[in-house]
Amino acid sequence: MAQRLKTYYLENAVPKLMEQFKYKNIHQVPKLVKITINRGLGEAAQNAKSLEASLNEIALIAGQKPVVTRAKKAIAGFKIRQGMPVGIMVTLRSDRMYAFFDRLINLALPRIRDFRGVNPKSFDGRGNYSLGLREQLIFPEISYDSIDQMRGMDVSIITTATTDEEGRALLKVMGMPFRD
């Protein structure tokens, strides 16, 4: 599946983007660099089972073991001490990145209830796109019986695009369903 999207990018997306933005060199064409999946776990400080469940879910979704992010400073208002687990994240590159992106746009996003497309304004000004997902059940790897609680995640797609317009064109050519 990863090869399918990568060959599509090389054979179809690159010529379209070169024509659209009048690039002189093939290396000027924007491409995907990495995808990071992040999940903040507020309840992980009190509940070790939720941390373990989240680690397993993200590992299934990403195909790679996530790393636990820990609190840098103690915050009394949130009942957090320094070094406590506060979230998990995984960074996907190369083939795993293309495989995840393919599953995200073709399988997961269409399974969202009342889905009309992703927000085209969620770019950061430098061609990178961020997307928040409210539940993990949209991925086919997660079964309804195996989850104890609905948890969302943040997906950031980092590209070599220098402007939002280039980043939007890249993701649109790759198949990202933007809302009109």
UniProtKB/Swiss-Prot annotation:
Belongs to the universal ribosomal protein uL5 family. The lineage of its organism: Bacteria, Bacillati, Cyanobacteriota, Cyanophyceae, Gomontiellales. Disulfide bonds: none annotated. One of its GO terms (cellular component) is ribosome. GO terms for molecular function: rRNA binding; structural constituent of ribosome; tRNA binding. SUPFAM superfamilies: RL5-like (SSF55282). The gene is rplE. Part of the 50S ribosomal subunit; part of the 5S rRNA/L5/L18/L25 subcomplex. Contacts the 5S rRNA and the P site tRNA. Forms a bridge to the 30S subunit in the 70S ribosome. Keywords: Ribonucleoprotein, Ribosomal protein, RNA-binding, rRNA-binding, tRNA-binding. This is Large ribosomal subunit protein uL5. The keyword Iron does not apply. It comes from the Bacteria. This is one of the proteins that bind and probably mediate the attachment of the 5S RNA into the large ribosomal subunit, where it forms part of the central protuberance. In the 70S ribosome it contacts protein S13 of the 30S subunit (bridge B1b), connecting the 2 subunits; this bridge is implicated in subunit movement. Contacts the P site tRNA; the 5S rRNA and some of its associated proteins might help stabilize positioning of ribosome-bound tRNAs. HAMAP family: Ribosomal_uL5_B (MF_01333_B). GO terms for biological process: translation.
